[in-house]
Amino acid sequence: MDPINRRGLLGAGAAALPALALNVAPSAAREIDPELPEHWTALLNLLSKHDDAFGPRAVQGAVRHELRVIAEHRAVARGELCEALMRVESCWSEFSAWLAHDCGDHGGRQGLLERALHLARAADYPDMLAWARARQAQWADAPMALRAAEAGLRTPRASAHTRAMCATRAAYAHARLGDAASVERSIAEADHLVATESPPLPPPDSGMTGLLVRRWEARCWAALNPARAIGMYDDILRDQPRTWVREQGLYLAYVANACADAGELDRARAEGAKALAIARTTKSATATRELKRLGAVLQAA
């Protein structure tokens, strides 16, 4: 998919949700189309691709609107359809939490992630329970991150690939605590889980779980041994899909910081300039934060 073709993405969105009167809340369960969970999952995957290409602010409003509509339908639905809509709503809530984080709205992020966890419990959705724990670990301080990641790993009936994501967050918590041996054990566990036949991660899922493990491994070594991380980041930047424009900017910022920390200041400036050009387009708060850190390191050098 062309990462700059907004019209194509929006047209695909129209196809993902056919002409359904979704702006009006249903008054009875019989009014709800049983295919809605599938349609909303398709739309979620599409909006995730739009976020990858254009950044969080391009989709945040649409995601919040759809979340309200999904909740209205879920409140009226009954039985298996209600449970399916709860699962869909939990996925949309987790994605909305990510968007809030990447827009710099940490308070909104917390509330949305708690909503995802609540819905996952109510719908008996172990993969989302584990995945939301991985997100909690990603955004917490190291000791709390380790507890959240380990709780995710212990989630009964969660798939191997989802638990692999919990293992990567445990590895990163160990890295922030300076424990290289535990990092290696956690990454080895993640590699083992990724190699296991497993259902995919909850939507939206890129299907590139192995690459996600490599990305977190690189971040671990950036904290412990920046010179080692540089080559890992280079490989990731080469292998990431070109449609992941926001991630390209973020990982250029990561490699720039690793270069600065390793004393390769000229390359740090060059990679930072590339990252800045992308961040100005995607308006990713995550990339902006990394670039501010880079600026402080370069100014002090």
Regions found by a protein language model. Give the residues of each.
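N-terminal secretory signal peptides and thylakoid transit peptides that target proteins
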Residues: 1-16
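Conserved binding/catalytic microenvironments
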Residues: 30-301
